[in-house]
């Protein structure tokens, strides 16, 4: 590792963490924009929030600018276009169920003809402001709820009775949009995942005229969805198991493992398994994002020393040298040393100190590189767009998701499992009563 990184990373990261994480005011001269794609399922979720959002925007941010693109971006994490589309639809179904968005039980991407008709409707309509946003939502409903008859009728009316309109707050272009997002003050916010962060920012700058109420079933960090003792015992008795596939040079891996181990594992009796991955170049991360997430999750962070490829190998070597039953705790302590104490485990003195702390008399003779490759292959088979990748197993079912943005799914899944369990028990009880009456 570069001597500069070993010396200066801990100093710089501590300073960065302690400085104010937000500039006082983001510029408003370019207003607030939302970027959509008619065949993007996240855009479908986003448009269901737009009328309410625009209704509480301060006048200086009105009208909300709507940018509609025909072009998708490249799928992330070397996923194929089909894998990405399948992932998005499944993820959107989960978000829709959690936050009560309207969504079809078996959604399908819109056809090319439907997309052409939808764009023509939106280009021709003279509606503006709230009226346009309600039309936009209706058009997305038609596209994603398989309402082709309604769409054809509206298309015929729009193309027959109206000319193409040209409004500055309505933009059609081919700039790639992978998934819907907002843009404000030069910053991008994921349309669903970052919506609450965006509204917090707008509220801080007094750019909202009323309190925002979005994503009503959002689960806050360090708040448990299940607190009833009986329900908690039922989840614990199901022995849930959680696999974590983590890139060791990625600070999100530390934040996620620490949060789950400190807050969820013992509480819900979750058995953790950790699968370290080979180096993926994620040491070049967004420092401000990692800092903000650490404060939101209330997980210790900085001073850190970003691991290089060599350092991640040394970290994995220590992990696999620990007894199997102690490996999760070993990984927690290894990542803690790197991300909260600025240890460089490619540096011999730091490595040997960590080895002593873990009480490892000897290092593993296993081929660590091969073990990491096996983990990479297992992780790739999950077809997820981002790291860390999580797989939760409970009550005979398996659930795969990814990133710190989806940690809330653990508790949401537990709640759904209990709901289905009670529903099944009630149905069985009802059937038993009915049979008794028949006899």
Predicted regions and their residues:
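C-terminal cap of thioredoxin/glutaredoxin-like
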Residues: 3-7, 11-12, 18, 27-32, ...
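N-terminal glycine-rich phosphate/pyrophosphate-binding loop and immediately adjacent elements
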Residues: 23
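Short pre-active-site segment immediately N-terminal to redox-active cysteine/selenocysteine motifs
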Residues: 36-39, 246-249
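Short, well-ordered beta-to-alpha junction loops that form the rim of enzyme active sites
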Residues: 37, 108, 184-186, 306
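Structural alpha/beta surface segment adjacent to cysteine/selenocysteine redox centers
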Residues: 45-143, 254-341, 421, 433-436
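An acidic- and aromatic-residue-enriched active-site/binding cleft used to recognize and process polar
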Residues: 66-68, 194, 247, 277-279, ...
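Residue-level preference for long, well-ordered alpha-helices that form the structural scaffold
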Residues: 81-84, 88, 160, 249, ...
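Phosphate-binding P-loop
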Residues: 236
């Amino acid at each position: 590792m570069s001597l500069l990184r070993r010396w200066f990373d801990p100093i710089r990261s501590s300073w960065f963490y302690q400085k104010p994480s937000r500039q006082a005011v983001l510029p408003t001269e370019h207003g607030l924009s939302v970027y959509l794609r008619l065949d993007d399922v996240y855009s479908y979720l986003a448009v269901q929030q737009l009328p309410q959002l625009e209704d509480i925007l301060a006048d200086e941010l009105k009208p909300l600018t709507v940018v509609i693109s025909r072009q998708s971006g490249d799928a992330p994490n070397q996923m194929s276009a089909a894998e990405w589309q399948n992932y998005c639809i499944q993820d959107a179904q989960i978000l829709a169920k959690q936050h009560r968005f309207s969504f079809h039980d078996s959604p399908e991407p819109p056809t090319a003809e439907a997309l052409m008709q939808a764009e023509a409707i939106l280009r021709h309509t003279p509606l503006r402001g709230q009226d346009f946003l309600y039309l936009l939502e209706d058009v997305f409903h038609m596209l994603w709820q398989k309402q082709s008859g309604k769409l054809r009728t509206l298309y015929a009316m729009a193309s027959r009775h109206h000319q193409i309109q040209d409004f500055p707050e309505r933009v059609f272009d081919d700039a790639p949009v992978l998934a819907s997002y907002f843009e404000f003050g030069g910053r991008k916010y994921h349309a669903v995942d970052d919506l609450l962060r965006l509204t917090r920012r707008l509220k801080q700058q007094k750019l909202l005229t009323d309190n925002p109420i979005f994503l009503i079933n959002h689960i806050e960090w360090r708040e448990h969805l299940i607190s009833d003792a009986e329900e908690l015992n039922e989840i614990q008795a199901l022995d849930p198991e959680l696999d974590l596939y983590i890139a060791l040079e990625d600070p999100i891996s530390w934040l996620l493992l620490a949060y789950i181990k400190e807050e969820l594992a013992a509480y819900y009796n979750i058995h953790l398994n950790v699968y370290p991955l080979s180096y993926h170049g994620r040491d070049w991360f967004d420092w401000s994002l990692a800092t903000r997430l650490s404060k939101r999750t209330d997980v210790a962070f900085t001073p850190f020393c970003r691991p290089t490829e060599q350092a991640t190998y040394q970290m994995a070597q220590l992990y696999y040298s620990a007894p199997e039953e102690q490996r999760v705790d070993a990984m927690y302590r290894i990542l803690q040393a790197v991300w909260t104490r600025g240890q460089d485990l490619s540096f011999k003195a730091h490595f040997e100190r960590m080895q002593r702390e873990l009480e490892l008399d000897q290092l593993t003779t296993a081929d660590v590189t091969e073990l990491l490759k096996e983990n990479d292959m297992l992780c790739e088979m999950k077809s997820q767009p981002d790291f860390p990748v999580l797989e939760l197993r409970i009550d005979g079912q398996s659930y795969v998701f990814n990133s710190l943005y989806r940690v809330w799914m653990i508790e949401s899944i537990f709640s759904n499992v209990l709901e289905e369990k009670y529903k099944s028990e009630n149905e069985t009880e009802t059937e038993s009563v009915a049979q008794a009456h028949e006899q």
